[in-house]
Swiss-Prot record:
Residues 20-144 form a propeptide. The keyword Signal applies. Induction: Up-regulated during water-avoidance stress. The keyword Cell membrane does not apply. Gene3D superfamilies: 6.10.250.1920. It comes from the Eukaryota. This is Corticoliberin. InterPro entries: Corticotropin-releasing_fac_CS, CRF, Urocortin_CRF. The modification Isoleucine amide is found at I185. Residues 1-19 form the signal peptide. It comes from Mus musculus (Mouse). Belongs to the sauvagine/corticotropin-releasing factor/urotensin I family. GO terms for cellular component: extracellular region; extracellular space; neuronal cell body; neuronal dense core vesicle lumen; perikaryon; synapse; varicosity.
Length: 187
């Protein structure tokens, strides 16, 4: 158990750590596909898109490490308002449908802006903000009105959905292993 945990932690550290470019490779100037030396920052040029970071996703009892664009996931095949709960309590969602719903929920969570815990300002700080100007306060209120409300009900609903999908996946794996066992014993 400890060995598996150490190996998993080591793999995650290697996969998620940012590697510095090798200077020997950077010195090769005209070699095709060779990385170039980092350029100094120029604030007049438009910012280039950042490379996507790997995302660790847990489905059932397995962990997947997704690299690249999360928008190109199986979630694109489903409509945005389909959930495993709308399919009915009696019918179990298929593995692909459960995975697609999980990716859809994950994408929704990633697209929500993160709020800081200390977003409330002290009364003295609020007075100082009012003294700075009403324009800045109006921009802040406008930005806040655009953010979707984050509620505990939504969080617990998503948690229940993910747990239900994990439970369904675990039951499917158990049924598959039971079928294999019965085939072996039946022979």
């Amino acid at each position: 158990m400890r060995l598996r945990l150490l190996v998993s932690a080591g793999m995650l550290l290697v996969a998620l750590s940012s590697c510095l470019p090798c200077r020997a490779l950077l010195s090769r100037g005209s070699v095709p596909r060779a990385p170039r030396a980092p350029q100094p920052l120029n604030f007049l040029q438009p910012e280039q898109p950042q490379q996507p970071q790997p995302v660790l996703i847990r489905m059932g009892e397995e962990y997947f490490l997704r690299l690249g664009n999360l928008n190109r996931s199986p979630a694109a095949r489903l409509s945005p308002n389909s959930t495993p709960l709308t399919a009915g309590r009696g019918s179990r969602p298929s593995h692909d449908q459960a995975a697609a719903n999980f990716f859809r929920v994950l994408l929704q969570q990633l697209q929500m802006p993160q709020r800081s815990l200390d977003s409330r300002a002290e009364p003295a700080e609020r007075g100082a903000e009012d003294a700075l100007g009403g324009h800045q306060g109006a921009l802040e209120r406008e930005r806040r009105s655009e953010e979707p409300p984050i509620s505990l009900d939504l969080t617990f609903h998503l948690l229940r959905e993910v747990l239900e999908m994990a439970r369904a996946e675990q039951l499917a794996q158990q049924a598959h292993s039971n079928r294999k066992l019965m085939e072996i014993i039946g022979k």
